[in-house]
């Protein structure tokens, strides 16, 4: 299990800062796919009408986890950057700190 605090003091590359400042940490989430992207328009056009599924549906999934991406926002100048972590099954943001001799709970 990976536990990351909600604030982190790290270097800010923004034009005004260029020094270590506190950053607000959030987890990156994928945005909604645009229906106007060229590939989506082409796919929808091909799918319309009779004839069933026209392109192969992917089934051979190899990975069991995704890499966690942190979004850091500077509290001073609002500059945002993204940092990727290693793969993990359990990710927690701002959870309680681990104490010695305590049992693991999920």
Swiss-Prot record:
Xref: Gene3D superfamilies: 3.10.450.80
Gene Ontology terms describing biological process: translation
Organism: Coprinopsis cinerea
Family: Belongs to the eukaryotic ribosomal protein eL42 family.
GO cellular component, one term: ribonucleoprotein complex
UniProt name for this protein: Large ribosomal subunit protein eL42
Region entry Disordered, spans: 36-56
Gene of this entry: RPL44
Single GO term (MF): structural constituent of ribosome
InterPro entries registered for this protein in UniProt: Ribosomal_eL44, Ribosomal_LSU_eL42, Ribosomal_zn-bd
Family annotation (Pfam families): Ribosomal_L44
Ribosomal protein is among the record's keywords: yes
UniProt entry keywords in alphabetical sequence: Ribonucleoprotein, Ribosomal protein
């Amino acid at each position: 299990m990976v536990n990351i605090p909600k604030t982190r003091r790290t270097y800010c590359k923004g034009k005004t800062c260029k020094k270590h400042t506190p950053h607000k940490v959030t987890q990156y989430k994928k945005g909604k796919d645009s229906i106007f992207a060229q590939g989506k328009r082409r796919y929808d056009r091909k799918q319309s009408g009779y004839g069933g599924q026209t392109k192969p549906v992917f089934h051979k999934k190899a990975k069991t986890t995704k890499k966690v991406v942190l979004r850091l926002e500077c509290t001073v100048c609002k500059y945002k950057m993204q940092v990727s972590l290693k793969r993990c099954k359990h990710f927690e943001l701002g959870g309680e700190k681990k104490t010695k001799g305590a049992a693991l709970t999920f």
